[in-house]
From Swiss-Prot:
One of its GO terms (biological process) is killing of cells of another organism. GO terms for molecular function: serine-type endopeptidase inhibitor activity. It comes from Apis mellifera. Serine protease inhibitor which exhibits antifibrinolytic, antielastolytic and antimicrobial activities. Displays antimicrobial activity against bacteria and fungi. Likely functions in the innate immune response to microbial infection and possibly in the venom, as an antifibrinolytic agent. This is Secapin-1.
Length: 25
C-alpha cells in the first residue's frame, strides 16, 4: 500500500515520489 509520510519510512519500505511504498506479503 502507499501512504503519505515523511522521508523517514518504516523498515522494509522505499521512499518514492514523496511517498512510502511498503510491500506487504
Amino acid at each position: 500500500y502507499i501512504i503519505n509520510v515523511p522521508p523517514r519510512c518504516p523498515p522494509g519500505s522505499k521512499f518514492v515520489k514523496n511517498k512510502c511504498r511498503v510491500i506487504v506479503p
